[in-house]
Amino acid sequence: MNCDKVDESEIDLTPQSVCPHCGAVGELRPNIVWFGEMPHHMDEIHAALERCGLFLSIGTSGEVYPAAGFVLHVRRRAPRARTVELNLEATGNQPLFHEHIYGPATEVVPAYIERVLAGRWQY
């Protein structure tokens, strides 16, 4: 969108879609980060990473930046935070994680969250 507004409408986008905020035609896009784009609000993301006590990396190759660098940022700026990789297989960032749990996210994530909620995790 030309106006940079975010609209929460659930509509099918076409080349003729009109922005409800500025009226621009054909400039709408989904509110996601495409491959090769930089996410908005990186300062806020880094600040949140520096405050975290538990960092989970779920279902990622760990190779696409800037997200691939988040675990290193946590290790450097939030050294007391626990880092956990939940993935199908090890990534290139594997040495940066305190714990590794491999398997389908549909299985390992609920099991890990259950452990956390039951107090059966190390910090």
Segments and roles (model prediction):
Residues M1-Y123:
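Conserved catalytic alpha/beta core of Sir2/sirtuin-type deacylases, generalized to analogous enzyme cores
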